[in-house]
A protein has these predicted regions:
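Juxtamembrane helix-start motifs in multi-pass secondary transporters
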Residues: 39, 180-184
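Hydrophobic transmembrane alpha-helices of multi-pass small-molecule transport proteins
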Residues: 51, 112, 121-141, 160, ...
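Conserved small/polar residues in nucleotide/adenosyl-binding loops
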Residues: 203-205
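Small-residue-rich packing faces within the transmembrane alpha-helices of Major Facilitator Superfamily
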Residues: 19-20, 45-49, 107, 133, ...
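Specific transmembrane alpha-helical segments of multi-pass solute transporters/efflux pumps
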Residues: 17, 55-96, 102, 138
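Glycine-/small-residue-enriched transmembrane alpha-helix faces in small-molecule transporters
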Residues: 1-38, 77, 81, 85, ...
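Specific alpha-helical transmembrane segments that line the substrate/conduction pathway
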Residues: 38-49, 87-119, 159
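Loop-to-transmembrane alpha-helix entry segments
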Residues: 66, 99-102, 118-138, 149-153
């Protein structure tokens, strides 16, 4: 398999698991076995523990500068904010509506990139986003929305903004050049801690 095909395959596989995770967490939370935040903590903690041995070995071979470490930790904070905001929106939105709204992530990345870096958005990109918006409209059952649904929409939009900030921050700081195992381990570890603090804080509000 050529490097290009291998990269495309891994990217599709990554997208599959990224999309599967919230579906599984939503189903688990509805059974009462765990809350949304509990599911997120388990997700990020297990990922961190699985990556930890490989991350330590890679970090020992090539230590990460403190500046890049801080930048990576901030990426983890944005990741935690993205997930926590999305799952918080489910308190006011049906799960299907919340997931549909999350498809706005690419649109926010495009708009933020255009605003910050003055990038031109191609007609093809607008067409793809228009198709996504039509899909969201078809997936959303507006009659199922509860009173106060605007709060859920606000949290879903905050989640999309956090995701866009995560993408733009990583691109601006060239974090894709870092060791992927070390980077992912730090991001998921920070996200697990961030979600835990969010869960504790919400319990005392």
């Amino acid at each position: 398999m050529s490097p290009k095909k291998k990269g495309c395959f891994l990217m599709i596989l990554s997208g599959f698991f990224y999309g599967l995770a919230p579906v599984l967490i939503l189903k688990v939370s509805r059974t009462g076995a765990s809350s949304y935040t509990g599911g997120l903590m388990i997700r990020y903690t297990v990922t961190t523990l699985l990556l930890l041995p490989f991350a330590i070995r890679s970090a020992c071979r090539r230590p990460m500068p403190y500046r890049q470490l801080g930048q990576t930790v901030l990426s983890g904070v944005l990741t935690a904010c993205t997930a926590a905001s999305l799952y918080t929106s489910y308190r006011w939105l049906p799960g299907g509506v919340g997931m549909a709204v999350s498809y706005l992530y690419p649109l926010f990345v495009l708009l933020l990139g255009a605003a910050i870096y003055h990038r031109r958005i191609t007609a093809y990109a607008w067409l793809v986003e228009a198709m996504a918006l039509v899909g969201i409209g078809l997936m959303c059952d507006l009659e199922a929305l509860q009173l106060g649904a605007w709060k859920g929409v606000a949290f879903a939009v905050l989640s999309a903004l956090s995701f866009a900030a995560y993408i733009m921050w990583g691109e601006a700081k060239r974090l894709s050049k870092l060791d992927p195992i070390v980077y992912t381990g730090i991001v998921t570890g920070t996200a697990a801690l961030g979600v835990a603090l969010f869960k504790i804080g919400r319990a005392h509000v």
